[in-house]
UniProtKB/Swiss-Prot annotation:
Protein's pathway: Nitrogen metabolism; urea degradation; CO(2) and NH(3) from urea (urease route): step 1/1
Family: Belongs to the urease gamma subunit family.
Main location: cytoplasm
EC number: 3.5.1.5
Organism, scientific name: Shewanella halifaxensis (strain HAW-EB4)
Protein name: Urease subunit gamma
């Protein structure tokens, strides 16, 4: 199977999101890369489900709470940007202050 660099990046991000989700389900607090991966993965899946950019920008702020991440992580994550494919093309989804 041949994958483009973009497809490889998406696959790696999705894998990191799955690892983060499993750790969260086990009751572990997520670190910075895990938190960003989980939020990004949720946004990509939402785009695949047909949600709008505006809806995903709001949804991205509900994926994680400060209690679910390690101390200091909410202050480190100011913005998460994910390039997603929508029915009308590729768009950049930005989530500002995603962990409340």
């Amino acid at each position: 199977m041949e994958l483009t660099p973009r497809e490889k990046d998406k696959l790696m991000l999705f894998t990191a999101g799955l690892v983060a989700e499993r750790r969260l389900n086990r009751g572990l607090k997520l670190n910075y890369p895990e938190a960003v991966a989980l939020i990004s993965c949720a946004i990509m899946e939402g785009a695949r489900d047909g949600r709008t950019v505006a809806d995903l920008m709001n949804y991205g702020r509900t994926v994680l709470t400060a209690d679910q991440v390690m101390e200091g992580v909410p202050e480190m994550v100011h913005n998460v940007q994910v390039e997603c494919t929508f029915p009308d093309g590729t768009k950049l989804v930005s989530i500002h202050e995603p962990i409340v």
